[in-house]
């Protein structure tokens, strides 16, 4: 099912406006609209309710044209549990991440779409698979993503990544201002950690615990 955004902006808040557009197109009922307008403590949507009600749906994004958010759990994305655990280790997530689905053109297969997750500060981050994996800030919040679509800087950051112009998202790769505060980056590489000891192929099993301990790189790029 596709959710088509209308043009009417008659509600007071962006959350209620988005809900009204969904309802206008017959996508969700009154109860669903009430859920969409209810704020979580950080001012965003209640993620648990959002995931429960929208799971399995393509939600059209206002920008760019043809892009959708397919709401699903991490099991329906290309990422493995190892990749998600290492994604959480990036400073930009502040140690918390909730995968909410995939973003991309509606006709693309799941593994060709970026994986979207909500970080501790409420921002929406996209995990991109490339020669060197990277994470890009897609929106300042989930309500903003649904209301406006991807940030216009998103594709500029993807291009910077392709040109090798990003920093790594671990603590050693961070930039700080004169007061020692971390300068927020809109995109960063996912560092591929080095093996701390030799692994003998065929004789030693590579486990999730080894990955989480920082002994092996992404499961997608061995």
Swiss-Prot record:
Keywords: Activator, Host nucleus, Ubl conjugation, Virion, Virion tegument. It is found in: Virion tegument; Host nucleus. ISGylated; ISGylation regulates UL26 stability and inhibits its activities to suppress NF-kappa-B signaling. GO terms for cellular component: host cell nucleus; viral tegument. InterPro entries: US22-like. Pfam families: US22 (PF02393). Isoform 21 kDa is first detected at 6 hours postinfection. Its expression increases at later times, when the additional 27kDa isoform is also be observed. Belongs to the herpesviridae US22 family. Plays a role in the inhibition of host NF-kappa-B. This inhibition affects both the canonical and the non-canonical pathways. Blocks the induction of host IKK phosphorylation. May also influence the normal phosphorylation state of several tegument proteins including pp28 in virions. Also suppresses virus-induced ISGylation independent of its own ISGylation. Interacts with UL25. Interacts with ISGylation machinery components ISG15, UBA7 and HERC5; these interactions inhibit global protein ISGylation. This is Tegument protein UL26. The gene is UL26.
């Amino acid at each position: 099912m596709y959710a088509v955004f209308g043009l009417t902006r008659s509600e007071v808040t962006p959350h209620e406006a988005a809900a009204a557009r969904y309802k206008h197109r017959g996508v969700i009922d009154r109860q669903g609209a009430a859920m969409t307008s209810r704020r979580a403590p950080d001012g965003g949507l209640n993620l648990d309710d959002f995931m429960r009600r929208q799971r399995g749906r393509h939600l059209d994004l206002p920008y760019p044209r043809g892009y959708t958010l397919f709401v699903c759990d991490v099991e329906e994305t290309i990422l493995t549990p190892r990749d998600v655990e290492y994604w959480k280790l990036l400073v930009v997530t502040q140690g918390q991440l909730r995968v909410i689905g995939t973003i991309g053109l509606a006709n693309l297969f799941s593994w060709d779409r970026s994986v979207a997750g909500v970080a501790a500060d409420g921002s929406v981050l996209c995990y991109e698979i490339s020669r060197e994996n990277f994470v890009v800030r897609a929106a300042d919040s989930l309500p903003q993503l649904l209301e406006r679509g991807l940030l216009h800087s998103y594709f500029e950051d993807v291009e910077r990544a392709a040109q090798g112009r990003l920093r790594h998202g671990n603590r050693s790769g961070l930039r700080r201002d004169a007061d020692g505060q971390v300068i927020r980056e809109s995109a960063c590489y996912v560092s591929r950690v080095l093996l701390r000891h030799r692994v003998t192929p065929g004789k030693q099993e590579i486990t999730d615990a080894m990955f989480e301990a920082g002994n092996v790189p992404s499961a997608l790029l061995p």
